[in-house]
């Protein structure tokens, strides 16, 4: 589906130069001389390689037709995951590499979003927010205001994140998975 270059947005998938690319970020530029263009950071969905591309604002790009389907995580091993479609209960197996480094967030019965292009799975995403328990946290010295207001903590999945000083071992916190950061203390 052809779309104007000016309408490119992060999160879209483009069919560009014979490959599928995820638009990571965009910036509209209007130079003093010449036509406006969109500077886009693209990620190749097959290889994972990122690169910069310029699109004319008044030109056209091919947007890939993508279908998003929700699947429930059932079980997995080091190389593949078995998932169940939440609508028709069909089970499929996908390589764990489709999740990349976000596979550490997998939890039993978690709902994943799979992206399909022409019947093939091209990408998988964990939810944006995941609740995890803090298993290790640095101690904070009272009145310590000269240094950063965050401390390092280790989560139950082994991931290390920065958390506010009031977070203690055993507490559950919400992690924003796209950038692996603390979001808030989990509500009971």
Swiss-Prot record:
Biological process per Gene Ontology, one example term: peptide biosynthetic process
Top-level taxonomic group: Bacteria
Pathway(s) the chain acts in: Protein biosynthesis; polypeptide chain elongation
Entries under SMART domains matching the protein: EFP, Elong-fact-P_C
Pfam families, per the entry: EFP, EFP_N, Elong-fact-P_C
Cystine crosslinks: none
Role of this protein: Involved in peptide bond synthesis. Stimulates efficient translation and peptide-bond synthesis on native or reconstituted 70S ribosomes in vitro. Probably functions indirectly by altering the affinity of the ribosome for aminoacyl-tRNA, thus increasing their reactivity as acceptors for peptidyl transferase.
Membrane-crossing residue ranges in chain numbering: none
Keywords tagged on the record: Cytoplasm, Elongation factor, Protein biosynthesis
NCBIfam families, sorted: efp, PRK00529.1
Gene Ontology annotations for the cellular component aspect, listed alphabetically: cytoplasm
Protein name, entry field: Elongation factor P
PROSITE patterns cross-referenced by the UniProt entry: EFP (PS01275)
Any GO molecular function: translation elongation factor activity
Protein biosynthesis found in the keyword field: yes
Family designation: Belongs to the elongation factor P family.
InterPro entries: Elong-fact-P_C, NA-bd_OB-fold, Rib_uL2_dom2, Transl_elong_fac_P/YeiP, Transl_elong_KOW-like, Transl_elong_P/YeiP_cen, Transl_elong_P/YeiP_CS, Transl_elongation_fac_P
Record has Hydrolase as a keyword: no
Subcellular location: Cytoplasm
